Amino acid sequence: MFNRLLKKINKVKSLEFDKATEELENFVYNNSNFLYILGEIGAIPESIEHDSTEEKLFSKVSDIVLSRAFIEIGLNSEVLKQRGNSADVFAESKFYGYSLVADAKSFRMSRTAKNQKDFKINSLNNWRGNSEYAILCNPYFQYPKKTSQIYSQSMNYNVCLFS
């Protein structure tokens, strides 16, 4: 299933970014094998060239997967179209009215020294707007293993760290 996703990314990479994103949303939202995609999305494959369109699309798919996960637990959710300086996912409770903004992160396994700025804790707090919650979703093995500013920042800014 994950290989089908990578082939889909390769197929749509020549489209305009918004159109490619729409194609990938359809692929993820309408896929009955969603759990296979969910299990693999956290690490950018080394076969994807650094700073390429495919890498940007893979990162966008991680946001699409997060949005689908929110839908699976009963929230209304969408991937936001705005690029740069905003959260990537918005979700809202159907029953309780609370809302949240979120960002999903994917890193290469070969990238060992992640900078605290890569996690954008402060930015997520600023992008919260009128939403009650801000969430960063990242595979547990990609979070820093030792002391890191992201943990104190997430506490100070009330940003939830999901894995």
Q: Model segments located where?
A:
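Conserved alpha-helical elements of sugar-nucleotide-dependent glycosyltransferases
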Residues: 58-62
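Acidic/His-rich structured neighborhood in mature extracellular/periplasmic domains
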Residues: 100-108
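Active-site beta-strand-loop-beta-strand hairpin of nuclease catalytic cores
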Residues: 91-101
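Interdomain/boundary linker segments immediately adjacent to catalytic/signaling cores
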Residues: 1-57
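Short His-Asn-centered micro-motif
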Residues: 80-82, 104, 135-140, 162-163
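Charged, structured surface patches that assemble and position nucleic-acid processing machinery
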Residues: 150-163
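Short, charged, amphipathic alpha-helix that recurs within catalytic cores of restriction-modification
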Residues: 107-152
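A short acidic/basic microdomain associated with nuclease active sites
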Residues: 67-89
